[in-house]
Structures are given as C-alpha cells and as structure tokens.
Amino acid sequence: MLLKGKTAVISGAASKRGIGRATAELFASHGARVAILDINADEAKAAAGDLPPVEHGAHIGLRCDVADRASCTSASDEVLSAFGVANILINNAGITQPVKTLDISDADWQRIVAVNMTGVLNLSQVFIPNMRQNGGGSIACMSSVSAQRGGGIFGGPHYSAAKAGVLGLAKAMAREFGPDSIRVNCVTPGLIQTDITGDKLSAEMRADIVKGIPLSRLGDARDVANIYLFLASDLSAYVTGAVIDVNGGMLIH
C-alpha cells in the first residue's frame, strides 16, 4: 500500500465517471483516508460512503465551492477537525465551456477562471499551513493538454488560459514551498472518457481523434488517477514543479 496512514483531500471527486472519483477509489485502496470535496454535498457524502474502508477511520464527503474562499476555509476546517492532518491535496475540480474567443462573456471568463485556476489557489492556501506544521506534503494540480496546445475539443480559449495559469501557479508554489518539504506538481490529461466527455463524441469524432493518438485509444479516468497516485506517494519524493502529460502521445513535445 503506497498511502497507508496518509490522509488525502480531493476536490471535484463525486462524479461517478470522473477523474476525481477514480482517484479517491485508488487512494483508498492504497490505504489513504480520503476527504471528497464537491459542489454537491449529498453526492460527496455518497461517494465517500462508497469508498473501500481503511484501518484508521472513515472517509468523509463535504460540500466545497472551490471558487469561494470562505467555502474552502469551511471545508478545510471540517477536514482537519476530522483528520487532524492533510498529507495530500489533489486540486482536481474543474469546469469547461466550448465557446470561441469573440463569444466569451465577462461572466463566462470569470467563472471558468474562478473554478479552474483560483480554486487551485484557494484550496492550496487553506491546506498548506497544516502541511507546513506536519513536515510537508504533496499537492497535485489538474491542468490540461488544452493549456499546452492552445485549446481543445471541449474547452474554449478561457479554459485554455485558466489551465495554463494552473501550470504557472503550481511551478511557483513548488519553488516557494520546497524548503517546507511540500511538493507541487501538475497533470495535463488529453481526452479522457468521463461524465463530461463520454456522451458528446460521435463514433466518427472518436475515430478521427484516435487517429492522432499514438497509443490509439482515448484515456480512462484511471489513467490519470494512476499518475495522481504516483505524485501523492513517496515514489515521487524527489519530484516537484513537474508537468506530467497523460495523453497517449497526443502532444509529443
């Protein structure tokens, strides 16, 4: 077990086919006690209840709007009251919107940036002090291939910009908090089959996309969860400020 005795906080982890949920299940199977944060409180609690049991206490599910600092503070208070420590933070929550540059409204821009980028800052700010007090930790942040290639299939330019911002923020935090033994890394998935993407691809679209992927398939949520596990565990003890592509070779630098 790679995470036995550890506690992990994962945002955006209630959706049944989502990357966050797959990560929570994988972490629990490796011995971690997990706090699932999600905008929907009932779904978060249900998801936590479905996780494999661990030796050192029950998992919890809490409501958290990552775009709202007060909501993040409240969630962190509840997590630390229940667990005492947060060893791992997975900044996974995100939303997308497939609109073009000239169609992006101010409200669109603010919401996409607030959830995808500001949310990473908000949750990191409320959990880093506890990590410092307890000798370090690991933070992994969800970016996207969209940030690297200038857009994607389901995300507009504002999504691409927000996810690019996550890359810069994570690298800056890695540099700042390295002396505190807090590692910060990013994951940049390609097209992953989740609740968001699963029903939006026709057979023709899917076949066309797969032609451009050297591994000849779309990704699964577990493909990304496996990388989160690596970054959360001591297997990556000397890795910080890194960006790990999980795209089947869709983007080879």
From Swiss-Prot:
Domain of life per record: Bacteria
Pfam families: adh_short_C2
Residue ranges the record marks as coiled coil: none
Signal peptide stretch: none
Binding annotation for substrate: 144
Catalytic residue list: 159 (proton acceptor)
Biological process annotations from GO: fatty acid elongation
Entry keywords, A to Z: Oxidoreductase, Plasmid
NCBIfam families membership: PRK07231.1
Protein name as it appears in the record: Uncharacterized short-chain type dehydrogenase/reductase y4mP
Organism: Sinorhizobium fredii (strain NBRC 101917 / NGR234)
